[in-house]
Amino acid sequence: MTKTVIYPGTFDPITYGHLDIIERSAVLFPQVLVAVASNPTKKPLFELAERVRLAEESVAHLPNVQVIGFSDLLANVVKERHITAIIRGMRTTMDFEYELQLAHLNRALTDGVESLFLPSTEKWSYVSSTIVREIYLHRGDVSQFVPPPVLTALMEKNR
């Protein structure tokens, strides 16, 4: 069985920071599943189907990366798809505290599937979807933070 890792997130929108984690994961693991989450507690800039499409277009150059959308509990997706590990990007110590709690929870819910933390590269350590949305909503230039498909979608949304 091929070892597949999952990189979950809302990716609203997917950024170069996310893409960096995905590209590095694609070098380390035979199969990477990018799982775009529907989060009912958040009001997304892009609907789930659009976020999945933007993620697919952004990772098209990576043959061992697949993108799915999901609205189920992450642990259920992990078990159904026989995932080997959960990949999480880490920018700050605040991320670590939150992610560590999720890692413990996911390990319990998945019968032991581990979470692996990849630190962000310095270049992208300050980039988040939240920051990109804020800049975009205030009519700022986000071109240096998002892949071309996302920039195009944002420009079309702004018309």
UniProtKB/Swiss-Prot annotation:
For this record, the Gene Ontology CC terms, alphabetical, are: cytoplasm
Q: Where mainly found?
A: cytoplasm
Q: Which GO terms describe its molecular function?
A: ATP binding; pantetheine-phosphate adenylyltransferase activity
Q: Which domain of life is it from?
A: Bacteria
Pathway as given in its UniProt record: Cofactor biosynthesis; coenzyme A biosynthesis; CoA from (R)-pantothenate: step 4/5
Matches recorded under Pfam families: CTP_transf_like (PF01467)
What keywords tag this UniProt record? ATP-binding, Coenzyme A biosynthesis, Cytoplasm, Magnesium, Nucleotide-binding, Nucleotidyltransferase, Transferase
Check the record and name the InterPro entries matching this protein: Cyt_trans-like, PPAT, Rossmann-like_a/b/a_fold
Q: Write the protein's name.
A: Phosphopantetheine adenylyltransferase
Return the EC number: 2.7.7.3
Record organism? Mannheimia succiniciproducens (strain KCTC 0769BP / MBEL55E)
Could you list the residue ranges forming a coiled coil in this record? none
Site, as annotated: Transition state stabilizer: 18
Cofactor(s) named in the record: Mg(2+)
- Listed binding positions for ATP are 10-11, 18, 89-91, 99, 124-130
**Subunit annotation:** Homohexamer.
Give the protein family: Belongs to the bacterial CoaD family.
